[in-house]
Amino acid sequence: MTSEQFPWLTGIILLPILAALPIPLIPDKDGRTVRWYSLFVGLADFALMVYAFWQHFDRSEAGLQMVEKISWVPQIGLNWSLAVDGLSMPLVLLTGLVTTLAILASWNINVKPKLFHFLLLLLYGAQIAVFTAQDMMLFFLVWELELVPVYLLISIWGGPKRQYAATKFILYTALASLFILVAGLALAFSGDSFSFDLTELGLKDYSLWLELLAYAGFLIAFGVKLSIFPLHTWLPDAHGEANAPGSMLLAGILLKMGGYALIRFNVQLLPEAHIRFAPVLAVLGIVNIIYGALNAFAQDNLKRKIAYSSISHMGFVLLGIAAYNSLGLNGALLQMLSHGLIAAALFFLAGVAYERTHTLQIPQISGLAKQMPITFALFTVTAMASLALPGMSGFVSELTVFLGFTDSVYSSGFRTVTILLAAVGLVLTPMYLLSMLRRIFYGTYNIQLGQVLADAKPRELFVAFCLLVPTLAIGFYPKLTTQVYDVTTTALAAQVQSNLPVVALAQQGSLYSQMPAAEEATAVSMTAPPVID
C-alpha cells in the first residue's frame, strides 16, 4: 500500500465493527434508536464500498487491486493483508446490500435489540473480511469470527428448536475450520520459505501429494459452508429455526463464502490438484442438484423447503467450478450472486408470511392470495427467478454453467451424462416451487389464521424490491455483473488449463478428450494474480 493510497478496504471492514462497540451504551429502551443507528451504519458502509469500487476498481485488470498490506503479528508472520479482484468485489457488494436489507428486515425485533444489532454489525465486517483477506491466517481468523454472531443469532432469536440448530451449526462449521488451519499451515511450511501470503503461496511448487491432501482439507471445510452433500445437514435445521434476517444472511452470504473459498484456494492455489478432483466436484454437484430438489418436495416446513432448494442450486456452482473453463467459472460466480439475491428474497418473504400466520407449516396455510395479494405477487416473481425463468438472473447463471460444462474438456460421454442429470434438476425445481405457491396462496383460506391478514408494508415492499430489481436487471443484461470478473475468470481458467495436458497424460486421457484446446492453453500461464500497489 503506497502512502498516497487510502485504506478503503480496512475502512469498509472496520466501520461496522467499530460502530457496533458503542451500541450497549446507547440509551434505548424499545430498540428504536438502535435500529436507526444500525441502519445508518449499514447504509454508510454500503455507500463507502460503492464509492471506493467505482473510483478505484479497474475491471480490465485480472489481478489484485486496492492492495493493503501491513505487518500485524510479525512473530508468526501474520499480516493485515487485504485486496479485491473480479472474484471478490461483486461478493463484497452483495454482502453490503443483503446485510443492510437484513437490518431493515429486523425492524420488529424487540427481544434484546441492542445485542441483535451488535451481532449484525459485527457479522457485517467479518463477512467482508473473508472476501478480501489475502493472508491465510487472517482468512482463518475472520472465517472463525463470523461463526459466533451466527450461532448467537440462531440460538437467541430462533424457533423452538433453536438450541439444537445453533449447536449443530457451530459443531459442523468449527470442526470443519480445523481443516483450513491444518491445510493452510502445511502449505505455509512447505518449501524453503515460510509465508501465509496467498500470492506467495500461489508461487510455491508443491508435491502432488501435498496438493491433493490440502485440496481435500479445503474441500471438506468449504464444502460444509457451501452445503455439499453429505456435509449439508446443518443447513435445513439452521434455516428452519433462524428468523428471517438470519436466514437472509445464511443463504445470501454465508453459503457464498464456501463457493468463493473453493475458487480462491482450491482452484487458484492448487490447480493441478483441482484438475484431479474436478470430476468429483461434478459428481457432487449432480448429487446436490437432484438430492436437494427431491428433499424440497418432501418438506412441509416453508423455510426448510427453501433451504433444500438452496442446496440444489449450489450444485450448479460446483458444476461451474468443475468445468475447467472461464465460462464455467463465470456461471458459478453468477449463480452465487443470483442465488444470494433470490434466496434472501425468498426467506424474507417467508418471514413476512410467518409474521401474519405465525406458522411455517405449509398444510396449515392456504388461500393467502386474496388476503395478501402484494405478498403473493412478490413471492411469485421470486419463485420464478428461483426456477430460472428466462429474463431472470437464475436463468442466465444456470444456462452459463450448462454451456461452460458442455464446452469443457471432459470426454463426450461424461459430459452428456452430467448434463442430462443436471437437467433433471431443472425439471424438478419448477415442480416443487409451483406446488409451494399453489398450496400457500390458492385454495380455501384457513380461517384459523385470522379474519384479516395485513399485506406487505412499505418497509417490506422496499426490501423485496431492492432484492428483485437487481435480479431482473442481471437477467435482462448479464453484462452488468460479468464485465466485472470476465478478465479474472479468463486468467484463472488459463492457469488451470495449463496443467491439463500433464494430468491427462498421467491419467491416460480417460476423462479428457478435447486436448487441443487444453494444449493451446499451455501458452498462457498465471501462477499467481499480479499485485497492484
From Swiss-Prot:
**Pfam families membership:** Proton_antipo_M
**Per UniProt, what is the membrane topology?**
Multi-pass membrane protein
Q: What is its main location?
A: membrane
- NAD: is it a keyword of this entry? yes
Per its record, the protein catalyses: a plastoquinone + NADH + (n+1) H(+)(in) = a plastoquinol + NAD(+) + n H(+)(out); a plastoquinone + NADPH + (n+1) H(+)(in) = a plastoquinol + NADP(+) + n H(+)(out)
Which key words are in the record? Membrane, NAD, NADP, Plastoquinone, Quinone, Thylakoid, Translocase, Transmembrane, Transmembrane helix
Tell me which family the UniProt entry assigns to this protein.
Answer: Belongs to the complex I subunit 4 family.
Question: What is the role of the protein in this entry?
Answer: NDH-1 shuttles electrons from NAD(P)H, via FMN and iron-sulfur (Fe-S) centers, to quinones in the respiratory chain. The immediate electron acceptor for the enzyme in this species is believed to be plastoquinone. Couples the redox reaction to proton translocation (for every two electrons transferred, four hydrogen ions are translocated across the cytoplasmic membrane), and thus conserves the redox energy in a proton gradient.
This chain's protein is named: NAD(P)H-quinone oxidoreductase chain 4 1
Which source organism?
Answer: Synechococcus elongatus (strain ATCC 33912 / PCC 7942 / FACHB-805)
The beginning of the lineage is: Bacteria, Bacillati, Cyanobacteriota, Cyanophyceae, Synechococcales
Q: Which gene encodes it?
A: ndhD1
